[in-house]
């Protein structure tokens, strides 16, 4: 039997993989099918006004919800009585794994071998102007942290990947902080880049995941993070920080690996 079909009329279940996509399907179809809607994160604005009204309009057609973090499940329970299914992120150990020879990797990607390398692999800039920081991802926080680190650590290098990195790059250049930028890379390369790092930092204000947390965990990449998304499910409490105590955060690679490998 087919697991998925292109024609929703032939489906037993309709999966709204992102909340806004519900408007792309006919109400007639949604009424006649079992509908599951994935909610990856909720922001403060989602609990009132036009955003809550939009949620209520969509909820008429939703039978149950899917979330990837317990934090989102708890938030969602405040605005719905419908069933919420928690299925956490998964991670493929054939793609993401530890590589011991970090010196060779740094040489391969022209990363200074003697540097303390800090990674950030997610977009940081709004798409409408390619200048403004995407504040939900916390790039302003990232810059504050690496600026302080740069004053205390010799030979700091920031390693960036992904599109829409204009804000962070501009700020790094203002501060004269060394960086290496590899825009779009495949999984093999990204795994090698994780393995080139001394530290990965998640500075987001709100997240569904991010996937980088489990990818760091299973590759044994040292990571610290704000308390967003799945952070508290994967990372040791000492690896989770706020902007008042970030310099005290300590990576625990064994703890993160143990929790991430369960998702393989």
What is each residue range found by the language model?
Residues 238-247, 255-257:
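Conserved acidic donor-binding segment of nucleotide-sugar-dependent glycosyltransferases
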Residues 45-49, 78, 91-108, 114:
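Acidic anion/phosphate-binding donor-loop and adjacent secondary structure
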Residues 222-225:
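Short hydrophobic beta-strand element within catalytic cores of glycosyltransferases
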Residues 162, 167-188:
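Nucleotide-activated donor-binding/catalytic signature segment of Leloir-type glycosyltransferases, i.e.
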Residues 205:
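Aromatic "clamp/platform" in nucleotide-sugar-dependent glycosyltransferases that forms part
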Residues 106-108, 113-167:
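Conserved catalytic-core segment of nucleotide-activated headgroup transferases in glycan assembly
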